[in-house]
Amino acid sequence: MKKFAMVFPGQGSQTVGMLADLATEYPIVIETFKQASDALGYDLWYLVQQGPAEELNKTWQTQPALLAASVAIYRVWKEKFPQLKPEVMAGHSLGEYSALVCAGVLDFQDAIKLVELRGKLMQQAVPEGTGAMYAIIGLDNEAIINACKQAEEGEVVSAVNFNSPGQVVIAGAKAAVERAAALCKEAGAKRALPLAVSVPSHCALMKPAAEQLAVTLENIQINTPTISVLNNVDVKAETEGTEIRTALVRQLYSPVRWTETVEKMAQDGVLVLAEVGPGKVLNGLTKRIVGDLQAISVNDVASFNAVEEFLV
């Protein structure tokens, strides 16, 4: 068997109708969403299947929906391939919570309530319309970081997602982000694209949300991981509850170091990255980070049927 890692996507991978075909073949999908619905007090599966998209895209509803989707897919994997265990896991932003549930660190229902709260706190921290995020395409990290420093003028703007070489997301106060995006274009960026988000994630504007999240995290049971999980903030696999909590708090206002995460997996001998969750966002990034890594996205019946040919 090839050495493989599992990676879990973050916000932006959700779609109305996701996991519909998987649910018809694997009852564990509906069971997983029922557990999530019981924790939330509303029918999450109905929202995911029926929408509308603008409801599903509200961050405090997106986050539980994606977490439940990734955990449901992982549970199908465990049922179908009990012998295929990943070497390591990681999740992009919100996906880190999915990884921690699948590695046995967080209880699923605890995590569902936690990410709903995370979404609400993030939305409360920055009034809608006052923050922004832009994807900067085709400019090196240093030039982007410099553009953000130049654009600050007393406001918050910083590089927050190092997604792949030549794809970095910046976030902060709307005017400052727009200034930084313009400076990036001047410095030679191919494109600067505004992202359709209601919250500028992973920047200093999220510190108030992080402080409140920390209070709730103190009362959450943290177990020793059964599989290593590389965190977003330090690209490290922590095993102690205190360190895991601290990393989740810092994650809210710190950059997601995804490029380094995938590079570390490759250096450690991983040959295949299995994206466990809706969409194929991480699959696309993997190929740009380490060209010879194989990447598969597992989220429907057809992709599950192809898993073994990739790994065995």
From Swiss-Prot:
EC number of this enzyme: 2.3.1.39
GO molecular function: [acyl-carrier-protein] S-malonyltransferase activity
Keyword line: Acyltransferase, Fatty acid biosynthesis, Fatty acid metabolism, Lipid biosynthesis, Lipid metabolism, Transferase
Pathway: Lipid metabolism; fatty acid biosynthesis
Gene Ontology cellular-component annotations: cytosol
SMART domains in UniProt: PKS_AT
Highest taxon in the source lineage: Bacteria
Active site: 93, 202
Reactions mediated catalytically: holo-[ACP] + malonyl-CoA = malonyl-[ACP] + CoA
GO terms of biological process kind: fatty acid biosynthetic process
Recorded family membership: Belongs to the FabD family.
NCBIfam families: fabD
Name of the protein this chain belongs to: Malonyl CoA-acyl carrier protein transacylase
Organism of origin: Haemophilus influenzae (strain ATCC 51907 / DSM 11121 / KW20 / Rd)
Gene designation per UniProt: fabD
